[in-house]
């Protein structure tokens, strides 16, 4: 060493070189991740972890794997983080989010319960817990969690939306409409909000009013298949066969496979019969 510094032993030299290599792999991996070079980032992070365990790299690795659609591998990395930091609620929230993508609602619920234990005043895990319960066909429990979520965070629009959708599916149109109206007032003419309102109004037996709202949905998003399909059903019920045919034709143009098992190829039976058959097979509310 220069300037009178101590000469490193061969073992220390080796450790220093390994640390430099580790740091370089980690740095290159982060850089690659930020510019979208996922494959190279994965290689860097994997090689770095072979040299030394590092929680920050496990975190980065989970993010890259998630972007790649490698849900199981991403979950493994998050589990490693969760085991290392059992008091970190944010890790449990991320585990719940990935479990939702995997449709593993039992694991999702467990992560949410741990997160709410750690952060009882955080609305997010209650919302996620509601999604888990809904996935387990427990709408009553889901509504309870959503109510808790909006109690903690009064402007949590996604909780109002999911609660309204769940209430509507249960047949409680009055309560669903209350949430829908809150959303219209506080969120405005958002596609999902308008679609919800149209479904509520249709469920109340007001087809003309519902059609007018479906018109607004289509103005916001001209490719909203559900809006065309559901509006067409209402038009058919009102005797507007031409309008129903037009909407069903649009649905088939936007997504030909959606009705392939119902309508098939055009045949001599006539468009009216095909439209009736298609609409009778599809749940008009999409619930």
Question: What is each of the regions a protein language model found here?
Answer:
Residues 2-24:
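TPR-adjacent "capping" and linker segments in tetratricopeptide-repeat scaffold/adaptor proteins
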Residues 2-10, 245-246, 253-287:
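Terminal, low-structured helical/coil segments at or just beyond the last alpha-helical repeat
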Residues 18-56, 60-67, 90, 94-103, ...:
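Alpha-helical segment of the N-proximal tetratricopeptide repeat
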Residues 22, 55-56, 89-90, 123-124, ...:
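Helix-start (N-cap) detector for alpha-helical repeat units in TPR-like alpha-solenoids
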Residues 36-40, 68-80, 102-114, 136-148, ...:
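Structural signature of tandem alpha-helical TPR/SEL1-like repeats
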Residues 52-53, 86, 120, 154, ...:
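Short coil turns that delineate tetratricopeptide repeat
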Residues 60-61, 94, 128, 162, ...:
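Canonical tetratricopeptide repeat
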Residues 185, 229, 233-260:
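TPR/TPR-like (Sel1-like) alpha-helical repeat modules
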